[in-house]
Each structure stands twice: as structure tokens, then as C-alpha cells.
Amino acid sequence: MASNAPATKSGLYADPREDWLALRKEEILDPARPIVDPHHHLWDRGGQRYLIEELAADIGSGHNVIATVYVEARSMYRATGPEALRPLGEVEFANGAAAMSASGGYGPAAICAGIVGHANLLLGDAARPVLEAEIVAGNGRFRGIRHSSAWDADAEVAGMYASRPKGLLPIRSFAKALPASRRWD
């Protein structure tokens, strides 16, 4: 029977509904097939927590998840220092989760085996030191950046992306930083 309990929101997103999640057990179709989860986040903010313990429980459900790729979520940015370098904290955080995973204490999967961070490409050439610092902080795991270009005139729809400029992709400084971001191709 479906749950009719209303969703609650204690942070940026709706809170997990354990009653709803428990309604269906997913069948493991091919438990021997190796899987890399290509996109996940970790955070502890606004009363909501999803860290390595929660991820390990989710990927340890019977599927053969052998590795994961962490994708930036504006999580664990540095609280101080130059604004441009604050996203470096998220790469350091994801690399720390990868080190925890390497201990074997969270299951066999290589959690955060790949890391996708963020650099403000509107900085143009000034984004280069950020990218270089993220490559170092990723300890061989850094794979690229994500600079969201989502935009909507309605702040209610745009949510946390409401501050993004309209028409971001053709902005000259944004495009100028792209060659620096391709260094590791």
C-alpha cells in the first residue's frame, strides 16, 4: 500500500521517506555484472546528511557496484580563503571519503574513485589555478569539473541556481576557461 504521508523538507531537498523506500525491494538482475555508479553526491548540511555510511548502505544492496564517481554538489566548500578556491574544499572532502573507502571499512566498492569538482569558469584564465589545485587535491581521482548553467526567471523554479546568469554558455570568460579545463583529456 502506498504511503500518503506528506513530504517534509528540513533542508534544500525533501527529506528521505523511509516508509516509501521500503515499499519495494529492487530485484538484483545480474549480481555478477560490475557497475560503476557514475554520479553521486555526499553532504551534511541543513539538517540533511548523506555521507559515506549512507552511500555504502545504498550501493551494498546486492548489485555489484565496484566504484563510484563523486559529482560536485556545493558541499563542504571551504569557509574561508579566496572565493575562487573555496570549491577546493569539496574535492578535498571527496578525496577524504575515497581514502576512507580504501580502508575497506565501507565495503568492497571504491567510493569516490573519480571526482568531478567545480571551478567558476566565469573567471576565465583565473580559473586555471583552481583547476590545478583541484587536480592536486584529487590525488589522482580528479576527472573534471561541472559548472551548472541551469537558469530560470522564476527563482522558485531555479532554486539554488537562481544566481546563475541567463545565457551563461556563450559568455566570453566562461568559454575562455574551457581550454584549461581540458588539460587532462
Task: Kindly give the residue locations of the regions a language model identified.
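Helix-coil boundary/capping segments in enzymes
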Residues: 2-185
